[in-house]
């Protein structure tokens, strides 16, 4: 029996997959629970259409992420902080600080997409990785300078 899965089913497939199962399993388990629909020509055509729409949407998201990555590489960020002995900062520079500085320069990013393993605690230049998409990552150049007293 051929079925189209509506949701992920363990040991069988993911939502949207066309699967071949034993008639009893399909009739008595998958169909009554709404986990699958029969694979008639109408449903198969609808599935193909949904996959095409999803692929187009994914391509659009990836393209916009690549554009943001390019913009990030062209947008250096300079942050001024109070400094103590040996160029150590009072406090630290976090992903939120970098996101706010980028927002001030016209690049809107969620702070969770900025990958800082640990906050920046010294003066200097840093390459901070940014995860924009599952396949696209960018880098932003962050310069931390001593604030004039």
Swiss-Prot record:
Q: Which InterPro entries match?
A: Ribosomal_bL9 (IPR000244), Ribosomal_bL9/RNase_H1_N (IPR009027), Ribosomal_bL9_bac/chp (IPR020594), Ribosomal_bL9_C (IPR020069), Ribosomal_bL9_C_sf (IPR036791), Ribosomal_bL9_N (IPR020070), Ribosomal_bL9_N_sf (IPR036935)
**Disulfide links within the chain:** none
GO cellular component labels: ribonucleoprotein complex; ribosome
The cross-references to SUPFAM superfamilies, in alphabetical order and at most eight, read: L9 N-domain-like, Ribosomal protein L9 C-domain
Q: Does the keyword Ribonucleoprotein apply?
A: yes
Q: Name one GO molecular function term.
A: rRNA binding
The GO annotation for biological process reads:
translation
* Pfam families, per the entry: Ribosomal_L9_C, Ribosomal_L9_N
> Could you tell me the keywords of this UniProt record?
Ribonucleoprotein, Ribosomal protein, RNA-binding, rRNA-binding
Q: Does the keyword rRNA-binding apply?
A: yes
Function recorded in the entry: Binds to the 23S rRNA.
Q: Which HAMAP family match?
A: Ribosomal_bL9 (MF_00503)
Record's family? Answer: Belongs to the bacterial ribosomal protein bL9 family.
Q: What is this protein called?
A: Large ribosomal subunit protein bL9
What organism does the record attribute this protein to?
A: Anaeromyxobacter sp. (strain K)
Please state the gene responsible for encoding this protein: rplI
